[in-house]
A protein has these predicted regions:
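GST superfamily/GST-like fold recognition
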Residues: 197-198
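Catalytic alpha/beta core domains of metabolic enzymes, predominantly
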Residues: 64-65, 78-184
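Active-site beta->alpha loop and helix N-cap motifs at the rims of alpha/beta catalytic domains
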Residues: 1-80
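Interdomain hinge/lid region at the active-site interface
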Residues: 188
Length: 200
């Protein structure tokens, strides 16, 4: 509610409402929708190691229960489960499921997902240092950690990618590599919050 009030319609607000409990994730999603969120970011159920059929059911139940777009979040290093390309293809049939923040680092799966899913199912990089590579495979940009500290640079990188200027995007991506690594020198979000604190 505080974020929605502060933004005051100037930008879309996407609320993170994921949980390893379908019931809890649905309740959080409905609360966020009531608070005015424009969309929802839903991580895969962590710890439980759901099957692909279980993931489909989990996300479909939540998508059925709200009237705002959902972005799925695949981050197997944190959750212990990966969303398969075929699972994305099934979930993409739901009108409220619009894309994925892909932080799995599996470029073969990303290619297969792009081939199996309709064009309006968006893929965003979930790893700053993979932004250009994912955009080359049909991604739409990045849901970024680094942009909290270097917004102009990450905006420029995304613009170059969306213009298909991958020569310039690749150079900028390489220039940002050390900074991207520094933002993960400890468990996220400790480094980025420390950097923001240093910036005042």
């Amino acid at each position: 509610e505080c974020c929605v009030d502060h933004v005051d319609g100037r930008l879309p607000v996407i609320a993170g409402t994921g949980s390893n409990s379908t019931e809890n994730a649905l309740a959080l999603s409905r609360d966020a929708e009531r608070a005015g969120a424009d969309g929802l970011l839903l991580v895969t159920p962590y710890y439980n190691k759901a099957s692909q059929a279980g993931l489909i059911r989990h996300f479909q139940v939540i998508a059925d229960g709200v009237d705002v777009p959902l972005i799925l979040y695949d981050v197997p290093s944190r959750t212990g489960v990966t969303i398969a390309p075929e699972t994305y293809a099934e979930l993409a049939k739901h009108p409220n499921i619009n894309g994925v923040k892909e932080a799995g680092g599996n470029f073969s799966n990303i290619q297969k997902t792009r081939n199996l899913c309709p064009e309006d199912f968006s893929i965003w990089s979930g790893n700053d240092d993979e932004t250009a590579a994912i955009c080359m495979l049909g991604g739409k940009g990045v849901i970024s950690v680094v942009a909290n500290v270097l917004p102009a640079e990450m905006h420029r990188l995304t613009e170059l990618c969306l213009r298909n200027d991958f020569a310039a995007a690749g150079k900028l991506q390489l220039d940002l590599k050390d900074f991207c690594d520094a933002m993960f020198c400890d468990v996220n979000p400790i480094p980025v919050k420390t950097a923001l604190n240093l910036l005042g």
